[in-house]
Amino acid sequence: MKSSMSFPRATALAGAAALAGLAAITVSPATAAPAKSSAAVSCSSTLKIAMVTPLTGGASFLGVEQLSWAKYAVKTLAPKLGLKIKLVTGDTPVEQGPAPAQTVAQKYVADKTVVGVIGPSTSGAVAASSKTYFQAGIAHVSPSATRTTLTKGDNQEATKAFFRVVPADDIQGPTDAKYMIDTLKVKNVVVIDFQEPYSLGLAGEVEKNLKAAGVTTSHQSIDNKVTDFSPYVTNVPAAADIVFFPTQKPGDAQAFASQLAEQGKKAKVFGGDGSNDSSAFKAAGSYVSNFAPDITGIPADASIIAGWKKDNPGKTVGSFGPPSYGATQVMLTAIKNACKAGKGKIVKRAAVIAAVRKVTIPNWILGGTFSWSKTDTNDPAGAKFYIFQIQSDGTYKLVG
């Protein structure tokens, strides 16, 4: 099956300010317990949910795509649920580290009409802000944060108010490594990290699985702000089959692949979900993995796709938008159920956390029925990753 989807997570670098952006649409009809809100909120009033994602900087394409699908979900689903919802946005540029995520979280904690958050979209932003949201009783449902230790392990970086609708890197890493071992028959792999949470977690999972299978590996650690990769390309062994390159900036994956070719190296780039952008990463023969299938092949999604395209003329269905629609659907359903339980009021924002945990969605946008894992990690049940190879025309073909 071929896919010509745009698979993004970051393109052009731009050093933008870390202030929370405010864009809105209005639609009419674990540990210690989270803190109570100061006052109940009437469900007949306009409630706010916040989309927290990179809208500027190198990963802006991620946020722009996610926001378009969250807007469409609010527009089409909120009236059916009898809700009046205003969608606001908070910008978390990946180049600026944890500060923007913390600033945005404090802003929305202070606004008592914000009853839920879609995001944060990146693992670093989740780690930086989840405690703040939890202490205020705010559920936050990410459509794309995959770092394993956000929800698993002895030192979890997120709280029980955090949920994600996509699988974690402990699924992505083994999936990527298994494909390299079983299908590509690799003998020598270079693994790179970019000294930030997303790449460190994914690189670690891949390297662990490759080593367990007896594959020769070497490791390079690159600052996330580096743009000239030539010294690192020089250090790629001539015998290397693959360079595993888990960036959040697909343009960097393209640059690295181009420099490999310029230096006569045979290795191909294999990116994680952060590299999925066919407009920026188009080096033929390279590979990417992603947590979303091509939803254009799911018959039940036809009307959703048609409606989204009508609202976004000329845009291509990508891999990051549909999970954002799904995360928004989960949040809206939880808000509706919390309102019902509170007899027309959200007595405390933490009621939405409890409601999120009980959500199931039939005819899920990514296929099948959505539900939470029974492992109490707030991860989705039965989720998987997909492998794509970049073709000579720049399209992404599903290969695993």
Label the predicted regions.
Residues 22-30:
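C-terminal segment of classical bacterial N-terminal signal peptides
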